[in-house]
Structures are given as C-alpha cells and as structure tokens.
UniProtKB/Swiss-Prot annotation:
Gene: PGK
Name of this chain's protein: Phosphoglycerate kinase
PANTHER family attached to this UniProt entry: PHOSPHOGLYCERATE KINASE (PTHR11406:SF0)
Keyword Zinc in record: no
Annotated PROSITE patterns: PGLYCERATE_KINASE
Pathway it works in: Carbohydrate degradation; glycolysis; pyruvate from D-glyceraldehyde 3-phosphate: step 2/5
Cofactor: Mg(2+)
Entry keyword annotation includes Lipid metabolism: no
Record keywords, A-Z: ATP-binding, Cytoplasm, Glycolysis, Kinase, Magnesium, Metal-binding, Nucleotide-binding, Transferase
Binding site for ADP: G212, G236, F341
Length: 415
C-alpha cells in the first residue's frame, strides 16, 4: 500500500468548506474531558485551515465504542468546549451529524466558522452495525450507509482526515466522503511519513522489538517483520512461549500460549533462512503473583523459574544484551514492553530499553514506538519528545506493521 497521500499543505483551502475527520475519542468523567491530548493533536490542522482562509471547518468524530443510537454520556458537546478553549474562538456544536437541523445550523455562518458535529456513532450507518435503544443488535443496509455518507459529504468542499487512530476502520466517515480532494491533516501526514520511512526506506541494521502476552496475537506482525529486519528481539510474556518450546525451559506460572507455540519452530527456521538474528531473554525478575506487592525473585533460563513464581520483567543480563542490540540499530520498531512496567518492581527492563532508544534517537536513529502499552511508556517517563515518533493509533499502527491495507488511507487522494 502506497503511503504517499495528498497533504493539506498542497490543498487550496481559501473560501472552502473543510470537512475534517478527527479523533476526539477522549476520556470523560462527570461530563468533562479529562485528557485533551487528542484535541491538542488535531489543533495544528484546524488552525492551519483557518489561517488559509477556510470558509468553515466542520469537525466530525466518534466518542466511545459501538453505539448505533443516541446515548447522552457519549455526546461530543463537552469536547466542543475544549476545542473552543484551544482555538480561542467559538465552536458551534450541532446536535446531530446529518439531517436538516445540521445543514440549517451551518447557514448564515461567518467566514472562519468552526462547527463540531454530534457523535458519528449515534447513527448505525457510521459503522454499519450497532445496538438499538432497547439493546438489540442492529445493522444498516448498504443503501443506508451510502445515503449517510452522501449526507456527510454535502457538508464540505474539501475532505481532510486527521484520525489515524481509526484509519484501519472502513467506517462511513473514513471511506465514504468522496469529495474530489481527500487529504491528510498534519497528524495523519506525520504518521504516514514515519511509517513510510520504516517500511519502505529503512536504514540498516533494522531492529524490531516485539512483546506482548500472546504469540498468537503477533503472528502476522512477526511474519511481516521477518521480511524486513536484520534483528528481532522477542520479549514480554510471549518470550516464555518461545523459551519453553525451544529450550524446554521451566517457566513456572508464566504465560504460555499453546496455539502460538505450534509455530515457533517454523518462525525460527524462517528467521534463519532470511539471516534474521533472534534475541530472547536470558534472565528474569519474577513475582509470586501478578500484583504490585508481589514477592520478587530472579531466575535464568537454566534452571528456570520455580513453580510458585512467574516471569514479569527482563533481568539485568537480558537488558545489557538488549541495549547493545538497540545501540547498533539504525531503524527501530518497538511494539510491546519488556515487562509489567505499570508496576514499579517490574518496570526496570522497559525503562532500560526506553533509555537505550532515547540514546539511539540522539544519534539520528529512526524509531517508531507503537502499540498501546509501548505508547503508554513514553508519557510515564516523559520521553515523548526524546524519541522519533510515538504512534497515535494502536490498531492502525499494528495493521500497517503487519503489512495490511488500511481503508482510511486507501480512501485518500494520492500525492
């Protein structure tokens, strides 16, 4: 899939109605936004469109999971207040995203007006399926989805997409707005630029760090990475499946993925055939339970982890070796932490890896830190500005790394 798409910087926005898909799926508590990071992320694109003389900007987003009907707690109205504060100008909230009330609400607007539509997922047509007010599963017909998409399209002259986090979803607002110019906002453009560097033009040695609980969750990712990388670190809970399968290691109460174990030998043979060097942990920090107050211990591959304990982090020898591997890489993809970094007793391995990636970044190494847990590591240690890129889309970034086609990107105009 080509990642070179039309950028907002190459679109004439003067006197145009700009229809912009954003990701304002923000955390809420008691009707208030508790984290504005995603709103802040979209603001450069919104401000740029205003500066370039856009007639109006129509913002559309989802909030919450699959809905299919109007649910008060998922209203985007409180988000509009935060957007207004950030822009320093009024943002008119519209109580629906399509229909006569929406179009009438935009009439007689002054130049540079900003509108925020109500939650797209209040309409079952956005995702194609949802839940009725009485709790029954419902589906939209293709004709209904098409009509919904066309009604959204009528609200703009130019379509911008800055919602990388939903780029892997073939939802109406992502793929159905068939305006002549369909461009990336700055946030989307940044994501695509970094992934293009990583996947199409990587500098070598190219290293992938892949963690997570289950091997079976990362099958497609590992398979695709083996075609691209020079070295691969297998870490986190999934490492125990490799170690038990390959070395008959005693892993105690550690995670073991039986379905994933069935393909470990095949992967090792594939890696060997492609001259990819695989690195696995050699020692561990263990705990007698999955809890902050666990009694800790240490273990090595031989004699293994005792029956009462589980491996919850990489040990010092492991991290010394992994950091050496990181230090010689020129391109790094990191998807999955070294251990249970949310618990301080088991955060040392991930922190050591983060420090090594930060050090590599200062030397010009391109790196992408994606996956929900890995992306969370950066705010924990305040390293967002010290690494090349922290992806804003967990599912979207994983599917790109897996080599999949993303509907929301395919729908954009080519550069």
């Amino acid at each position: 899939m080509g990642l070179r798409k039309l950028s907002i910087a190459n679109v004439d926005l003067k006197d145009k109605r700009v229809l912009m898909r954003v990701d304002f799926n923000v955390p809420m508590k008691d009707g208030k936004v508790t984290n504005t990071q995603r709103i802040v992320g979209a603001s450069p694109t919104i401000k740029y469109a205003l500066d370039k003389g856009a007639k109006s900007i129509v913002l559309m987003s989802h909030l919450g999971g699959r809905v299919g009907n109007k649910v008060a707690r998922y209203s985007l109205n409180p988000v509009g207040e935060e957007v207004s504060k950030l822009l320093g100008k009024p943002v008119k909230f519209l109580p629906d995203c399509v229909g006569p009330e929406t179009t009438e609400g935009m009439c007689q607007s002054s130049a540079g007006s900003v509108f925020l539509l109500e939650n797209l997922r209040f309409h079952v047509e956005e995702e194609g399926k949802g839940v009725s007010p009485t709790g029954e599963k419902i589906k939209a017909t293709p004709e209904q989805v098409k009509a919904f998409s066309e009604n959204l399209t009528k609200l703009g002259d130019v379509y911008l997409n800055d919602a990388f986090g939903t780029a892997h979803r073939a939802h109406a607002s992502m793929v159905g707005c068939r305006l002549t110019q369909r461009a990336c906002g700055f946030l989307m453009d940044k994501e695509l630029t970094y992934f293009s560097k990583l996947l199409d033009q990587p500098q070598h040695p190219f290293l992938a760090i892949i963690g997570g609980a289950k091997v079976s969750d990362k099958i497609q990712l590992i398979k695709n990475m083996l075609d691209k990388v020079d070295e691969l670190i297998i870490t986190g809970g999934m490492a125990f499946t490799f170690l038990k399968k390959l070395h008959n290691m005693k892993i105690g109460k550690s995670l073991y993925d039986e379905p994933g174990a069935a393909i470990v030998d095949e992967w090792m043979q594939l890696a060997k055939s492609k001259n990819v060097k695989i690195h696995l942990p050699v020692d561990f920090i263990t705990g007698d339970k999955f809890a902050e107050d666990a009694n800790t211990g240490t273990a090595t591959v031989e004699p293994g982890i005792r029956d009462t304990h589980m491996g919850l982090d990489g040990g010092p020898k492991t991290m010394e070796e992994f950091c050496k591997v990181i230090s010689r890489a020129k391109t790094i993809v990191w998807n999955g932490p070294m251990g249970v970094f949310e618990m301080e007793k088991f955060a040392g391995g991930t922190k050591a890896a983060m420090d090594a990636v930060v050090a590599a970044t200062t030397k010009g190494v391109t790196n992408n830190n994606g996956g929900g847990d890995t992306a969370t590591c950066c705010p924990k240690w305040k390293t967002e500005a010290q690494v090349s890129h922290v992806s804003t889309g967990v599912g979207a970034s994983l599917e790109l790394l897996e080599g999949k086609q993303l509907p929301g990107i395919l729908a954009l105009s080519d550069a």
